[in-house]
Amino acid sequence: MKKETNVKRTGCYIRRNRFILGAAAGLLLAAALPFGALGAEKGWQMVDGAERYVDETGGIVTEQWKKRDGKSYYLDENGEIAADAWIQGTWHVDETGAMEKETWIYEDGSSQMAKGWYYLGPSGKAEKNDWKKLGDVRYSFDSQGRMRTGWHYENGDIYYLGDENQGYIQIGWRYLESDGRKRPAEGSVSKALVPGEPGGQWYYFNSSGKARRAEVGSYKESEIDGHRYYFDANGVMATGWRCVREQAKPGDGTGISRFVYLGGKDEGMLKSQWLETEERPWDSPEWEQA
């Protein structure tokens, strides 16, 4: 009986200690839980001196977008609001941390982004690898979202997008610095020269920004404002005597009918009247090629 009594008393003692230990464990568990797990309100809270977002479990939200007062904010790896920064190379937040939309951002090259202009669309995403009409002009953006400038080649077409203060398609006649013998490099900027200034060439860009150009080894005839012009494969307006036809006219044993005279450097128009000129077809570098 005494043993049985001890067993009962021991059993009673264990049950009491189970209760005591359970309560202590509960206190320890509460201390180990994330901030707010035991009743903290979900939403924006001041935690450790910074404004953070607490989820329904009481955890601090990290690397996510959260809204407040209609604006989106990005919470970094510490749960703090990112400010004046690029997010994943696609979005940009201002000094307050709010996502920016429908605005231009200029980078000077000191950040993760290359130097140049970027445009953030209605969703806040940077325009990338596409054309975008803003106002009355069209811009082109590369795969990183940077506004293209200078010469741009796409699907066989030639565009000129101006300098970093322009970046939009050029339309109409442009007299640009170029030797005319080869295409300028992608993205290179050509200085706009005064007509007649040495070192320049004439180009014509249509309403879509595409340069009038021919296939390699030939010339393209184009009528502009009632006048006929010829352009080579690089988009350069042809001048002087040029061999523009593959075959001479019947009865022409010299091949001179393959040539046309297009005037001086700043003319380029096809001449269809009698002219007195010191330039002769056989002085053209194309005469031997013909």
Each model region followed by its residue ranges:
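Extracellular adhesion/carbohydrate-binding repeat motifs centered on closely spaced tryptophans
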Residues: 2-290
